[in-house]
UniProtKB/Swiss-Prot annotation:
Residues 21-28 form a propeptide. The lineage of its organism: Eukaryota, Fungi, Dikarya, Ascomycota, Pezizomycotina. This is Endopolygalacturonase A. Disulfide bonds join C31-C46, C204-C220, C330-C335, C354-C363. Its EC number is 3.2.1.15. It comes from Aspergillus flavus (strain ATCC MYA-384 / AF70). Its main location: secreted.
């Protein structure tokens, strides 16, 4: 009898010990979140996340950082943000092999008019940046419809990222919107932006550092055009292997631009502007300047940043009558090995202030 009781007790204790061992639960296939707090706390619990009509509280970030590898994020309905003067970002996303997309009819609305005061990031209200895409590697962002960012749109610091068919519509900010850059790229490799449609009041694209970056099939309206730079004065001051092609820039201050920082060091190399069409440009159709200091041109170029192996191929179109067709202001010996083919920009003035124009280019 005692032996039987001992056996029963041993079996019971053994079962209890087994039950006490933690069991690792697999992530559910899909989750739908209706609040930013739930999304933040539950984002690693599902392989597919649907964000349904999220109202992000004022002063908070829709935190999608540290997602599990292979997660799909779907924006559904309307995503909105409470008002507060702060730096942001309104959204942040990171992870590997992530897919970010939206359901049919969805929109992400920053309602930037609450912050717009004509000063952008240079004073007035403190405005939140829209979206940090930092360490979003081997991933994709597809088909997002974004409206009214308070200031800059996407801050990109990632590797192997494809951004496809994204619309950023800040057309409502024509009067008071400022510094509403669409895509700011830095310290990134293998970034491909294809089919972007942008209405804004600053750079459609600004590449400050990075390599193997492409921007193609873009439409840029109302801003400052397609820019390399400004390059210099950062921890990473190299831009190389960039192709900007088959795009339109309309009703903008500049068409295509390379700008480097006064008295800084760095490299801009193997950059191609190909098949770019311009219209309604109000300042410069094509501009390369090596004189930026504190965000403004000085008129005096320096040569610490080499701008070499640059291609301008079939950059064509018109500027306004009081604009300048082409302006090239290079430091002594710093702009070399340019290819200049099929460039035809008309309608404006011819600059008398070009300096150190590379062989083959015209100003």
């Amino acid at each position: 009898m005692q032996l039987l009781q001992s056996s029963v007790i041993a079996a019971t204790v053994g079962a209890a010990l087994v039950a006490a061992v933690p069991v690792e639960l697999e992530a559910r296939d899909s989750c739908t979140f209706t609040s930013a707090a739930d999304a933040k706390s539950g984002k690693t619990s599902c392989s597919t996340i649907t964000l349904s009509n999220i109202e992000v509280p004022a002063g908070e970030t829709l935190d999608l950082t540290g997602l599990n590898d292979g997660t799909t994020v779907i924006f559904s309905g309307e995503t909105t943000f409470g008002y507060k003067e702060w730096e942001g970002p309104l959204i942040s996303v990171s992870g590997t092999n992530i897919k970010v997309q939206q359901a049919s009819g969805a929109k992400i609305d920053g309602d930037g008019s609450r912050w717009w005061d004509g000063k952008g990031g240079n004073g007035g209200k403190t405005k939140p940046k829209f979206c940090y895409v930092h360490k979003l590697d081997s991933s994709s962002i597809t088909g997002l419809q974004i409206y009214n960012t308070p200031v800059q749109g996407f801050s990109i610091q990632s590797d192997n990222l494809n951004i496809t068919d994204v619309t950023i519509d800040n057309s409502a900010g024509t009067a008071e919107g400022h510094n509403t850059d669409a895509f700011d790229v830095g310290s990134s490799t293998y970034i491909n932006i294809d089919g972007a449609t942008v209405y804004n009041q600053d750079d459609c694209l600004a590449i400050n550092s990075g390599s193997h970056i492409t921007f193609t099939n873009g439409y840029c309206d109302g801003g400052h055009g397609l820019s390399i730079g400004s390059v210099g004065g950062r921890s990473d001051n190299t831009v190389e292997d960039v192709t900007i092609s088959n795009s339109k820039v309309v009703n903008s201050q500049n068409g295509v631009r390379i700008k480097t920082v006064y008295d800084a060091t760095g490299t801009v190399s193997n950059v191609k502007f190909e098949d770019i069409t311009l219209s309604g440009i109000t300042k410069y159709g094509l501009i390369v300047e090596q004189d930026y200091e504190n965000g403004s041109p000085t008129g005096t170029p320096t040569n610490g940043i080499k701008v070499s192996d640059i291609t301008f191929d079939k950059v064509t179109g018109t500027v306004e009558s009081d604009a300048t067709d082409i302006y090239i202001l290079c430091g002594s010996g710093s702009c070399t090995d340019w290819t200049w083919s099929g460039v035809s920009i008309t309608g404006g003035k011819t600059s008398s202030k070009c300096e150190n124009v590379p062989t083959g280019a015209s100003c």
